[in-house]
Amino acid sequence: MHELAVTESLLQVVLQHAGKGGAGKVVSVSVRIGELSDLVNEWMQRYFDYLSRGTIAEGALIRIERIPATFRCDACGDVFPADPRTREAIRCPCCASEAMTLVTGRECFVQQIEVT
């Protein structure tokens, strides 16, 4: 249940930026989350609803966009999508190497804040 801590941090970012802009109300928050983060959308919205009570973000909708996992082959440099949760070994589609570095898939950040 690390959604609570992550959502609390996201709310702080939202309130800080909305406050700087003189917003009266936060309508929605667009968040980009890597598919490997294991954050559950429903719980993030529930925690956001709970934590934002009494703030200008109360009632705001969280819009979550998932970022797919991509890897860079350490041998040839090719960047490709793959699901590391599969039981099969991940291999580079260009050279079949198993040596790779995660490029995307663990991110979590506020992309946009809609205010009135």
Regions found by a protein language model. Name each.
Residues 1, 77-79:
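Intrinsically disordered, low-complexity, mixed-charge
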Residues 73-76, 92-95:
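Short cysteine-rich clusters marking metal-coordination/redox-active sites
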Residues 66-67, 100:
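Structured, basic alpha/beta domains of bacterial-type, RNA-associated proteins
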Residues 71, 90, 108:
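Cys/His-enriched microdomains
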Residues 79-80, 98-99:
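Cys/His-rich microdomains that often coordinate metals
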Residues 1-63:
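Long, charged N-terminal interaction/targeting segments
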